[in-house]
Amino acid sequence: MNSVKEFFDSVAGNWDKREKKSYSELDSFIRKYVPISEGMKALDLACGTGVITSILYNITKREIDAVDISSEMIKCAISKNNNPDIHFRCDDFMNINNKYDIIVCFNAFPHFIDVEAFRNKAYELLNENGYLVIIHNLSRKQLDSHHSFLSSDISRSLNPINEEALVFNGFFNTEEIIDNDEMILLSLRKAC
């Protein structure tokens, strides 16, 4: 069995207690930093318990796909989001085949161990000029502390974000990088 799935299945029931920001704060955060607008087809990648899924839906005003490898996380997400236009799916990102205008990976990037496979799949799924947004509402230092007890098959330490961005060169154009004491943002646009 997949160790990332096993880990997140085991913590799903208490996961939302870890989020320190209110829904309103998360809504403002997403609207400020994620280049998403009404009408965009979006994927909430590694959606967990659906912390930002309804925010993405409220912005795009259209159906949202939300995928997570953990069935327990998906159960929590479904219980919080009773909306027929939000499609939760328990699956590996590598099995997704729909096309999107934007893929948002919120608070999950360190759990994608094979960054090149992640990059290739995101590129495949994005429409022309589509966005890949990797965003955390924690700093790298906070993330490293948060993940310090996890094995390397569940999470990895992030390099400075400008270094993480290098693997996306040739596939994506970098739109914005933020790597500070409060957050991480790597906003990328599919190169044509």
Which residue stretches match the model-derived regions?
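Conserved alpha-helix/loop element of class I SAM-dependent methyltransferases that forms part
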Residues: 21-38
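Class I SAM-dependent methyltransferase SAM/SAH-binding core
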Residues: 43, 49-94
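A short glycine-rich, Lys/Arg-flanked "PGG" loop and its adjoining helix->strand segment in the class I
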Residues: 116-128
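Conserved class I S-adenosyl-L-methionine
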Residues: 133-158
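Short alpha-helix
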Residues: 155-171
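Core SAM-dependent methyltransferase catalytic element
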Residues: 171-192
